[in-house]
Amino acid sequence: MDLSQLRPPEGSRKKRKRIGRGSGSGHGGTSCKGHKGQNARSGGGVRDGFEGGQMPLSRRLPKRGFRSRILKDIVTLNVEKLNGFQTGVEIDEHRLKESGMVKSSAEKIKILGKGEIDHPLTVKIKMISQGAKAKIEAAGGSVIEVV
């Protein structure tokens, strides 16, 4: 047996349906669309969610709240992640984005107190939790809250 004798398994290569090519093709005449009606017309069919005039599910269910366009998502970062920086380094929002710890598109960053930090760092940031601040200062570092 060589490469020229290889064939795909029976039934694995299905022919595509060529509609409107005469009755001999098996898909002629009405082109698999049935007789008349909205779905038989060109561009026919109904939009997503349309239920034939019945009140659609999306309108029957109650709505609650909304997502404010003014508020931006706050990206959180735990103290344990700051161990990746060297001792004595000054960390600000720009450096966090530069290092890849936070996406560059992040508008607000808050440092939280999960985990431990084992060396002193200087952190300049707008938002930081009390626990995170205490842990950084306990490790010999300092926190400068920027306004």
Curated annotation (Swiss-Prot):
Q: Which UniProt keywords apply?
A: Ribonucleoprotein, Ribosomal protein, RNA-binding, rRNA-binding
> Which residue ranges traverse the bilayer?
none
Q: Which organism is it from?
A: Syntrophus aciditrophicus (strain SB)
Q: Which PROSITE patterns does this entry report, sorted A to Z? A: RIBOSOMAL_L15
Enumerate the GO terms in the molecular function aspect: rRNA binding; structural constituent of ribosome
Q: Which domain of life is it from?
A: Bacteria
Provide the family line: Belongs to the universal ribosomal protein uL15 family.
Q: Kindly name one Pfam family recorded for this protein.
A: Ribosomal_L27A
Region Disordered: which residues? 1-63
What's its job?
Binds to the 23S rRNA.
Give the lineage.
Bacteria, Pseudomonadati, Thermodesulfobacteriota, Syntrophia, Syntrophales
Q: What is this protein called?
A: Large ribosomal subunit protein uL15
Q: Which GO terms describe its biological process?
A: translation
**Database matches in InterPro entries:** Ribosomal_uL15, Ribosomal_uL15/eL18, Ribosomal_uL15/eL18_sf, Ribosomal_uL15_bac-type, Ribosomal_uL15_CS
Regions of biased composition (Gly residues) lie at 21-31
